[in-house]
Amino acid sequence: FLVGNTMIDTLVAFDKKIQQSNILETLKIKSKEFVLMTMHRPATVDHKDGLKQLFSIIELITKNHQLVFPIHPRTLHRIEEFGMKSLIAENRKLILTEPLDYLAFQKLISDCAYIVTDSGGIQEESTFRQIPCLTLRANTERPCTVDIGTNELVPFSQEKISDRIDAIVQNKYKKGIIPPLWDGQSTKRILEACMKFLSSESHVSTLLK
């Protein structure tokens, strides 16, 4: 049975509370005038050269936008370990926060100009919200977000990322669609499928054997 995406069910169910979040006021940012970043994978942050490249990308992004970066403990630990905390303080358009609660984070996804990430679930959430998402990875477990959604896989290269940022800023980025059945009703369809299966004659006869 094809039922949809239960993660989107959660997003739809809590959307009213998400939109009521005051995180934009707390961070003193305006809708569509900031970029959202998440970075935590070992391949990205566990070596000094990778972190240097990441800070170059941050400099690139903050030429045009403020950048909100809810930083993962792993990433912060590596920045401290490699003696790179000064690079954070030097960029006045970089807004570093602790990891945020679900409602606040989803509000940032909803209101950002675009996303730069190496994470997983945010690829689906951004596609549902129709927000451009640059995923700095070679592959993804969520291919439909690339095939028909707003997600793109981009090499961890300043030149490649700059090209895609320019496309977004110039409104030349691809126009994705929300995948079929991402409508907040997948849980209902799961229940209906289970009830149909449990009430079928073939299933009853199997249980009686």
Task: Walk through the language-model features, giving the residues of each.
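Nucleotide-activated sugar donor-binding and catalytic core shared by glycosyltransferases
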Residues: 1-69, 75-209
